[in-house]
UniProtKB/Swiss-Prot annotation:
It is found in: Golgi apparatus membrane. Xylan acetyltransferase required for 2-O- and 3-O-monoacetylation of xylosyl residues in xylan. Catalyzes the 2-O-acetylation of xylan, followed by nonenzymatic acetyl migration to the O-3 position, resulting in products that are monoacetylated at both O-2 and O-3 positions. Keywords: Disulfide bond, Glycoprotein, Golgi apparatus, Membrane, Signal-anchor, Transferase, Transmembrane, Transmembrane helix. Residues 1-30 are cytoplasmic. Belongs to the PC-esterase family. TBL subfamily. Coiled coil: none annotated. Disulfide bonds join 202-253, 224-289, 233-533, 449-529. This is Xylan O-acetyltransferase 6. Glycans are attached at residues 122, 320, 422, 458. GO terms for cellular component: Golgi apparatus; Golgi membrane. Residues 140-184 are annotated as: Disordered. A motif (GDS motif) lies at residues 276-278. It is an enzyme of class 2 (transferase).
Length: 558
């Protein structure tokens, strides 16, 4: 057992007690009775002993507790400082920054007091004593902390990402923004899902050409990267651009202005295909330029000579829509079906054979057919006896209008049997005219369409520029024979006859090469009065298509 320590106040009375006890023993030995003084002395010694025990008790508990309580305010201050630092750190850490908090180390006496909390009773007593002395010194100094005893240390708090509440708020904000964006997109789509108004009583093809520098052209030559050199007349040296600024004005109504976004919305997840000869390719290039103007770069592509070389395909990525051209100059099979090698002097057709081409037309949502210019090479058409696949070479010559009508009958039968009218809309383009006889419009001494800069206007007599209207009549008859599938005639012939100024003339290609200056100076030989500059007349043809497509009711699957 540990020996009990004596109070400092007990040392002197203890010696006196020993002396008194010695004297008492001697007195009893002598048989002398205890005196009053001895009794008083004994009481004094007993009181002193009790006092000593109280001092021990106080030293064990109250002094230690009192010392710890005396330092508690300093610990609370430290905790509050660190807590505030953590709050500040949390705010900064949301931004992903590293946080450094400067913390003051407590004086040595405070550290001793903190350590004493986990020590034995004896250690607690020693610490309590030390803290008691420190408190006394602090009190004497006016409770002033000696800053020289404080030591600073940097505590780096870990960077943290946004907390759960902040993450939830961020997600809510993102969801709200996404909903708002979706709502705006839906509203924009709804706005595009309009139906263009074209009065049923209005004949769009009867009217006049009006010069309009404000609204024409719809696009610029330099802004359409997909134009071929065959049609870029300004780039190829043409000096006037007035041919681009004539707008067709129907007599009894207005031709709806082309809206590329509205048409693309109609074409979403759909295919539009031009089928026919180089004039339909001319119109296809126009349509590509009309729609591509509102599509950002990187979201549109053009692929040429696919499907065995017969197809060119423009793809609008965002709309999952295609604008395609399929080469079939006679619609039926012929010896001119190779789009890259088709300059065949003796053109032969297989007038009842269309399946080779037609299987490529299945599943298309808008089909635009034409066939004309390749029929004008000779007065009679050569019709194959047998088939190309079997190597047949014999043919018979048939009058052009008869052969033309027979080919259109073959085409009409296939359309009526294979096209779903609930899905596919079919158009037929009437003939695109040539301008190779300038005397027809009163330019005696002129050379074809060369140097023409104005349309034919204010005519009071009929115009004959060489169009074979017999073929036009044959097409009209065949179009009346359809039973299941309605086919819409786009009647461009008469209004296009007025545009002698709009051909490529000498500002074009010949056999894949641009005309040289020497060739351009010889329009009688090299002027192309068949095809059209772009921007130009084919843009108006496509406005007619647009008016028909955009004025139709929206189908249930759109």
């Amino acid at each position: 057992m540990q020996q009990r320590r004596k109070s400092v106040f007990a040392s002197a009375p203890f010696a006196m007690k020993q002396a008194a006890l010695g004297a008492g023993v001697a007195a009893r030995r002598n048989g002398a009775p205890l005196s009053l003084a001895a009794v008083v002395f004994a009481l004094f010694v007993f009181a002193t002993f009790l006092y000593n025990e109280d001092i021990k008790s106080i030293a064990d508990f109250p002094f230690g507790a009192g010392a710890l309580r005396a330092k508690s305010p300093d610990l609370h201050v430290l905790q509050e400082t660190v807590g505030a630092a953590h709050l500040a750190a949390g705010s900064i850490a949301k931004r992903g920054e590293e946080v450094i908090v400067r913390v003051l180390d407590a004086p040595a006496s405070t550290a001793m007091a903190a350590a004493a909390g986990s020590s034995s009773n004896n250690s607690t007593i020693e610490v309590a004593k030390a803290n008691a002395n420190a408190n006394a010194n602090a009190a004497d100094a006016g409770v002033k902390v000696d800053e020289g005893q404080e030591r600073e240390r940097d505590v780096t708090l870990p960077s943290v990402k946004e907390g759960g509440a902040d993450e939830a708020r961020r997600r809510e904000d993102e969801e709200a923004a996404e909903k708002e964006s979706s709502a705006k997109a839906a509203a924009a789509t709804a706005a595009l899902r309009t139906v263009v108004s074209v009065p049923d009583t209005c004949d769009l093809y009867r009217g006049n050409w009006v010069y309009d520098e404000v609204n024409a052209p719809v696009y610029k030559e330099s802004q359409c990267e997909f134009l071929t050199e065959q049609v870029t007349c300004m780039r190829n040296g043409r000096r006037d651009d007035s041919y681009q600024k004539w707008r067709w004005q129907p007599t009894d109504c207005d031709l709806p202005r082309f809206d590329a976004r509205l048409l693309l919305e109609r074409l979403r997840n759909k295919r539009l295909m031009f089928v026919g000869d180089s004039l339909n390719r001319n119109q296809w290039e126009s349509m590509v330029c009309l729609v591509q103007s509102v599509i950002p770069k990187g979201k549109k592509t053009l692929t040429k000579f696919v499907n065995g070389g017969n197809s060119n395909i423009f793809y609008a990525h965002e709309y999952n829509a295609t604008v395609e051209f399929y080469w079939a100059p006679f619609l039926v099979e012929s010896n001119s079906d190779n789009p890259q090698v088709h300059s065949v002097p003796d053109r032969v057709i297989q007038w009842h054979s269309i399946a080779k081409h037609a299987h490529n037309w299945l599943g298309v949502d808008y089909l635009i057919f034409n066939t004309y210019i390749w029929w004008l090479n000779t007065l009679d058409m050569k019709v194959l006896k047998g088939s190309f696949d079997q190597g047949a070479t014999e043919y018979v010559e048939v009058d052009r209008p008869v052969a033309y009508k027979e080919v259109l009958k073959t085409w009409a039968k296939w359309v009526d049997r294979n096209i779903d009218p609930n899905r596919t809309t079919v158009f037929f383009m009437s003939m695109s005219p040539n301008h190779i006889t300038p005397e027809a419009w009163g330019n005696y001494g002129g050379i074809k369409c060369a140097m023409e800069t104005l349309p034919i206007t204010n005519r009071t007599t009929s115009l004959d520029v060489g169009t074979d209207w017999r073929l036009y009549a044959g097409a009209q008859e065949v179009l009346q024979t359809f039973r299941r599938v309605p086919v819409h005639l786009v009647d461009i012939t008469a209004l296009s006859e007025l545009r002698k100024d709009a051909h490529t003339s000498v500002h074009t290609l010949r056999q894949g090469k641009l005309l040289t200056p020497e060739q351009q100076s010889d329009p009688k030989t090299y002027a192309d009065c068949i095809h059209w500059c772009l921007p130009g007349l084919p843009d108006t043809w496509n406005q007619f298509l647009y008016a028909r497509i955009a004025s139709a009711p929206w189908s249930s699957d759109q």
